[in-house]
């Protein structure tokens, strides 16, 4: 559950203000789950997007802090896609990142939306980018608990891994910015497209339409169909297991249903 800005102690706020100057307004972010606090801060130095996470103890990082550390390490190396990281603060048991504020809206992935062209252009560019050495996570490890052999998903391509509509910001002049690089990984390039599938289904595309849209990407059409089938099955199984938890949020159950639909489609179209 996300915390309010008021959860930040005076020591932390003072460290932030050393970068921003006096703060005039704080607008909490409506979505996202990789930080305890996320907000647009209006301050003397201008607007900045702030993400903060509380450590478990002075010596121990929690999952949100680890995510932010990972993002802070990666973002400077993906400047063609991500908002700039202006500063980092560690004080009072908190890690705080200050990002360039992007004046943009969340993308619309519904059928017929012009944003789909922007999404495609962004993904094409991402697939052509070199994976920085600082990207340490291997995407195939996500499914190691549900499959004996996950090597078909391995590779050296740069993967954002979460190009959902809320993470693709589109500015008034049509530029795109990819935010939330906490789980960027390296792997087979086509896996990025596989991870997009639930978001396209959720936006109203039929599975066959999703398959047609994905066919514009060389990495997808060149991938071994049996590898895509394997991915579809382990993707659905991992989300099914997550959704079995009685306390899981509604979006997890929905994601499990969407990945199941895609796996069933792949079985039927094989």
Indicate where each model-derived feature is located.
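An alpha-helical support segment within catalytic cores of ATP-dependent transferases
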Residues: 8-19, 125-161, 169-177
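A conserved alpha-helical element in kinase catalytic cores
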Residues: 9, 34, 47-92, 97, ...
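Active-site Asp-x-Gly
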Residues: 171-212
């Amino acid at each position: 559950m996300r915390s309010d800005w008021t959860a930040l102690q005076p020591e932390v706020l003072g460290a932030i203000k050393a970068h921003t100057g006096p703060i005039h307004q704080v607008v909490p972010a409506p979505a996202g789950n990789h930080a305890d606090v996320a907000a647009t801060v209006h301050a003397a130095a201008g607007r900045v997007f702030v993400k903060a996470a509380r450590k478990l103890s002075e010596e121990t990082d929690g999952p949100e802090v680890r995510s932010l550390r990972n993002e802070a390490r990666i973002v400077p190396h993906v400047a063609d896609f991500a908002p700039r990281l202006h500063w980092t603060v560690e004080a009072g048991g908190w890690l705080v990142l200050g990002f360039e504020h992007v004046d943009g809206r969340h993308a619309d992935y519904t059928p017929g939306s012009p944003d789909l062209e922007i999404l495609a252009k962004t993904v094409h560019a991402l697939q052509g980018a070199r994976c920085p050495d600082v990207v340490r996570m291997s995407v195939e490890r996500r499914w190691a608990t549900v499959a004996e052999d996950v090597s078909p998903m391995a590779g050296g391509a740069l993967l954002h891994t979460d190009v959902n509509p809320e993470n693709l910001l589109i500015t008034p002049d049509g530029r795109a910015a990819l935010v939330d690089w906490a789980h960027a990984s390296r792997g087979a390039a086509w896996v990025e497209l596989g991870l997009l599938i639930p978001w396209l289904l959720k936006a109203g595309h039929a599975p066959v339409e999703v398959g047609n849209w994905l066919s514009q990407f060389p990495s997808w059409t060149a991938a071994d169909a049996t590898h895509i089938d394997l991915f579809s099955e382990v993707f659905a199984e991992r989300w099914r297991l997550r959704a079995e938890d009685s306390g899981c949020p509604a979006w997890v159950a929905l994601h499990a249903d969407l990945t199941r639909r895609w796996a069933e489609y792949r079985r039927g179209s094989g």
